[in-house]
């Protein structure tokens, strides 16, 4: 045993000997300016443990600071700034070999940064005698760290923060200062350990003019002479933690980092620092609130300087700062109370906009206003959390999983505030077993199922939920005991923990406010369950300048809703419509049928009990925002549901009910007539009734273009059918709809084989010279049928071509009719500043309200020269480019010059005729226009082409448009693309 101990001691002494032998040569080489080899560094690794300078205990070398700051028993700090009492500590001379590196004056000069050599030259000369007279005492690194920490904290308590300015001498040597930063960082440990205790005290007690250089963070150091600022504080995280209970946050002053200095290089002039106490006195007292951002550990700068620094360093445009949830605070300033996040600011904007309108205010009662007022009285974190939860789907949420770090790291106090104010429900009101089970994650649900001996380890969540629900339906065998469902509910709630859900009573109030604000949005795209998240984001984009709407005058004169109950009925109908649409999209036709029948019963009850004459008096473009219009849309979708379920007789009955009225959804009458005739003729084989439906549909003035042609074509097929000869006399007297055919051409292309055969056809074509430059000769590209046709017409001399379908002409229509579309003087077509078109654009009212202006513009275009047309395009493009308009796709033309070249080919006469037709019935004329527009800039010739792939045919709307374009003098044709083998495309 003794021999083993001896060997261990010998080994340890041997290591110490090697260490002393290896360290000294390196120090000598360093002092002589040489560089130690990297191999010697790896051969002589430092020891894994070091002796504590206070208690002598061996601790891991990487944890020496943590041991001294938090674990060492001999490290004591007394109050009133007294010195630390160190007992049972080894002498400084015993630790000299580990904690100090003695150098000659020449060596110290060699290792000193140029910054300290130049900036401190004057002070060194003036005080050379005094510095030589002072005794030199070696102080261990740990002792110096604790002394600096204690003295720095004491000075911050007694005298606050010392204000510093840049001296003239430091300004002259700014370049040398920048070059010396790397050396300062590397030499800081050696520099700090060489200073004696007296000098360290003098450094902290002296108050010279400090430079604008950053002081090194996370490094314990003292400065050479008076070039270091007197307000140097240690930044050891453990010391700050130990003193956090003694020092107020307001008085904490920390050092800047070397990174901050790199940023300060952009500014050659010094920054005038203000009094810290003044700045902090202006801050809000609620700094401990969950909403307030913690105080930054950096010197204070003015707000103007902060913004300049951010713009210079980050190169961020000024308008992009509005996009942030919280204002940025630069690295050299304390964070001030932040601005509100965009979703809360915009939510407040919605509330103000709705409640400022007198007609909208009438739609809320005292209880509604009380709810809104209670929300406004919430704290800022409470309002932020409520809006966040309002934007989510209405369901129960586990509090532990609700995380919004921008609000607070601990949301429990905020949740308690919302519960106390009646905005949130707690788990005490959670009584539905299905809701609790859906709330649990899969692991907890499996544990719950194991408790009741259900499921296997790999069971899916839905299977576990169904199994537990089925088990809950069983009754207990013993009287007086809780049933199984109650036991499962109790266990599930225990597993879920604290849960909350928005109160429905308060949520519906804000939902109605949002509904009034977003009334003009496309209803299918606006998910009511999202709490208007899309609209709030739209407001954010507008406020930040990233989204712009056309300029127009909001003019409201008509009252949409008669009273509060009318608004509530409309909201209920809208939710029912959304539920039906969701069920249809998911393919749940039985569920959709149940929702449809429920809505039909509700609509019948409203018709029997309410006076709807107010809705009938509204113009048709406002009537679509009524409860009657919404329920009629549900009934129209019910026809599709009934047809999916093969209930054609019920579908026919519903279609006849819809056609019996002409107040709601009048733009769908043509589609209803067409569907009624199809069901009667094809599914129910009631041919005579089908002929009657065709006759009534053709005579209906509200049935438009494509649907009338469809009815006429059905009658023609019935007339030619051999099995329906007995009905030819009935079919002879029907009104006729004549459409003349246009030119048809056929090209061939190699079809790309793909599995399934579904979707659009994909063809292969040879790349052109420009396209094949990167891939060499013989490059083959995959393309659509329209691209294949474009390449074909390019070979015919049409150097320009666009595949835009109706968007090409609607864009030209919007550009040349912009001022008329957004003209003043038409009431109730603009209800809020976020509309992309007037509300009457898709109705007959659009043309009726602007008849004179539209006809005058059409006449002007008819007589206009090419230069006039191009000037009109350029003028609108330059003033309105980028504004969101339902008619214009700003990316349809690559440049305004391309649009100008197209109108030069089309001519004013042709454009006038097209625009006049679109203005009269945009709802039914926006579709059916040709796919391609190709033209030649050299010959000013153009061609309008409808492309049809394999097994594709023209629709009724396309046939009507082709005939109308032909009548206006356009060169139109239908290009059929047929699939072929590996041969190239060629025209027949």
UniProtKB/Swiss-Prot annotation:
Residue span, VRR-NUC domain = 866-978
**Null allele phenotype:** Increased DNA damage response, apoptosis and development of abnormalities such as kidney cysts.
UniProt cross-references to Pfam families, sorted A to Z: FAN1_HTH, Fan1_SAP, FAN1_TPR, VRR_NUC
The cofactor binding remark recorded in the entry reads:
Binds 2 magnesium or manganese ions per subunit.
Chain segments carrying region Disordered = 1-39, 87-115, 164-256, 269-307
Keywords from the UniProt entry: Coiled coil, DNA damage, DNA repair, Endonuclease, Exonuclease, Hydrolase, Magnesium, Manganese, Metal-binding, Nuclease, Nucleus, Zinc, Zinc-finger
Predominant location: nucleus
Q: Which GO terms describe its molecular function?
A: 5'-3' exonuclease activity; 5'-flap endonuclease activity; flap-structured DNA binding; phosphodiesterase I activity; ubiquitin-modified protein reader activity; zinc ion binding
Where does the record place a coiled coil?
636-663
Q: Name one GO biological process term.
A: DNA repair
- Residue spans of biased composition, Basic residues class: 8-20
EC number(s) from the headed UniProt entry:
3.1.21.-, 3.1.4.1
Q: Which GO terms describe its cellular component?
A: nucleus
Q: Where are the zinc fingers (UBZ4-type)?
A: 49-77
Q: How does it assemble?
A: Interacts with fancd2 (when monoubiquitinated).
What is this protein's name?
A: Fanconi-associated nuclease 1
Species the sequence originates in: Danio rerio (Zebrafish)
Name of the encoding gene:
fan1
């Amino acid at each position: 045993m003794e021999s083993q101990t001896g060997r261990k001691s010998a080994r340890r002494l041997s290591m110490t000997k090697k260490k002393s032998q290896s360290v000294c040569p390196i120090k000598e080489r360093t002092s002589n300016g040489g560089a130690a080899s990297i191999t010697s560094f790896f051969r002589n690794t430092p020891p894994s443990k070091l002796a504590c300078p206070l208690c002598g205990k061996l601790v891991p070398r990487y944890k020496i600071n943590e041991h001294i700051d938090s674990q060492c028993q001999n490290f004591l700090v007394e109050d009133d700034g007294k010195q630390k009492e160190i007992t049972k500590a080894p002498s400084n001379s015993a630790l000299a070999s580990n904690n100090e590196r003695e150098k000659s004056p020449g060596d110290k000069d060699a290792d000193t940064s140029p910054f300290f050599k130049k900036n401190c030259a004057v002070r060194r000369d003036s005080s050379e005698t005094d510095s030589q007279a002072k005794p030199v005492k070696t102080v261990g690194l740990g002792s110096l760290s604790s002394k600096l920490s204690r003295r720095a904290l004491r000075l911050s308590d007694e005298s606050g923060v010392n204000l510093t300015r840049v001296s003239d001498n430091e300004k002259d040597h700014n370049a040398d200062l920048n070059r010396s930063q790397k050396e300062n960082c590397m030499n800081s440990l050696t520099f700090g350990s060489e200073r004696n205790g007296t000098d360290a005290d003098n450094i902290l007690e002296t108050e010279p003019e400090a430079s604008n250089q950053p002081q090194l963070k996370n490094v314990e150091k003292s400065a050479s002479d008076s070039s270091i600022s007197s307000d140097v504080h240690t930044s050891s995280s453990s010391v700050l933690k130990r003193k956090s209970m003694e020092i107020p946050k307001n008085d904490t002053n920390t050092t800047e980092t070397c990174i901050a200095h790199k940023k300060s290089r952009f500014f050659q002039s010094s920054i005038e620092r203000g009094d810290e106490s003044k700045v902090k006195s202006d801050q809000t007292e609620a700094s401990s609130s969950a909403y307030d951002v913690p105080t930054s550990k950096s010197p204070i700068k003015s707000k103007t300087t902060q913004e300049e620094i951010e713009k210079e360093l980050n190169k961020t445009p000024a308008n992009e700062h509005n996009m942030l949830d919280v204002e940025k605070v630069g690295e050299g300033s304390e964070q001030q109370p932040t601005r509100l996040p965009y979703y809360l600011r915009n939510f407040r904007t919605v509330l103000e906009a709705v409640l400022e309108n007198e007609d909208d205010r009438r739609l809320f009662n005292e209880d509604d206003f009380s709810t809104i007022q209670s929300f406004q009285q919430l704290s800022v974190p409470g309002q932020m959390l409520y809006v966040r939860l309002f934007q989510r789907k209405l369901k129960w949420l586990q509090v532990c999983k609700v995380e919004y770090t921008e609000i607070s790291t601990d949301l429990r106090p905020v949740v308690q505030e919302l519960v106390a104010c009646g905005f949130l429900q707690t788990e005490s009101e959670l009584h539905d077993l299905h809701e609790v089970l859906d709330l649990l994650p899969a692991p907890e649900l499996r544990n719950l199922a194991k408790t009741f001996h259900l499921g296997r380890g790999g069971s899916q969540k839905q299977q576990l939920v169904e199994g537990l629900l089925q088990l809950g339906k069983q009754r207990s065998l013993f009287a007086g005991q809780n049933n199984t469902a109650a036991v499962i509910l109790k266990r599930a709630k225990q597993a879920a923990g604290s849960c909350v859900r928005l109160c429905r009573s308060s949520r519906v109030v804000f939902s109605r406010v949002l509904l009034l604000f977003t009334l003009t949005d496309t209803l299918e795209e606006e998910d009511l369950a999202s709490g208007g998240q899309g609209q709030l984001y739209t407001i954010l984009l507008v406020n930040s300048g990233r989204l712009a709407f056309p300029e127009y005058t909001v003019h409201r004169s008509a009252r949409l809703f008669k009273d509060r109950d009318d608004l509530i009925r409309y909201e209920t109908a809208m939710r029912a419509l959304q539920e039906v649409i969701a069920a249809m999209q998911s393919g749940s036709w039985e569920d959709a049928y149940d929702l449809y029948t429920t809505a039909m019963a509700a609509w019948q009850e409203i018709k029997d009990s309410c006076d709807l004459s107010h809705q009938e008096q509204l113009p048709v473009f406002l009537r679509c925002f009524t409860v009657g219009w919404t329920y009629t849309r549900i009934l129209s979708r019910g026809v599709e549901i009934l047809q999916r379920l093969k209930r054609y007789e019920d579908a026919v009955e519903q279609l006849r009910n819809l056609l019996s009225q002409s107040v709601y959804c009048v733009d769908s009458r043509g589609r209803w007539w067409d569907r009624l005739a199809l069901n009667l003729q094809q599914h129910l084989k009631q041919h005579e009734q089908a002929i009657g439906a065709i006759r009534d549909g053709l005579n209906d003035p509200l049935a438009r273009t494509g649907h009338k042609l469809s009815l006429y074509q059905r009658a023609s097929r019935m007339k030619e059918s051999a099995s329906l000869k007995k009905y030819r006399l009935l079919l002879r007297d029907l009104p006729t709809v004549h459409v003349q055919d246009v030119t048809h051409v056929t090209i061939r292309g190699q079809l790309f084989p793909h599995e399934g055969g579904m979707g659009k056809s994909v063809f292969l074509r040879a790349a052109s010279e420009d396209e094949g430059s990167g891939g060499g000769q013989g490059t083959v590209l995959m393309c659509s049928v329209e691209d294949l046709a474009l390449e074909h017409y390019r070979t015919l001399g049409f150097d320009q071509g666009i595949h835009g379908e109706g968007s090409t002409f609607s864009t030209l229509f919007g550009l040349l009719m912009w001022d008329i579309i957004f003209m003043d003087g038409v009431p109730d077509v603009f209800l809020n500043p976020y509309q992309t078109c007037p509300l009457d654009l898709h109705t007959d009212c659009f043309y009726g309200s602007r008849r004179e202006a539209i006809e005058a513009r059409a006449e002007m275009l008819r007589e206009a020269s090419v230069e006039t047309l191009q000037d009109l395009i350029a003028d609108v493009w330059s003033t309105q480019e980028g504004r969101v308009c339902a008619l214009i796709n700003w990316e349809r033309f690559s440049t305004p010059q391309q649009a100008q070249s197209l109108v030069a080919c089309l001519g004013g006469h042709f454009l006038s005729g097209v625009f006049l037709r679109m203005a009269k019935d945009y709802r039914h004329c926006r579709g059916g226009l040709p796919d391609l527009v190709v033209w030649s800039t050299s010959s000013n010739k153009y061609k309008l082409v409808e492309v049809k792939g394999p097994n594709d045919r023209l629709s009724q709307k396309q046939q009507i448009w082709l005939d109308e374009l032909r009548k206006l003098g356009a060169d139109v044709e239908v290009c059929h693309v047929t699939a072929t083998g590996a041969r190239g495309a060629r025209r027949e």
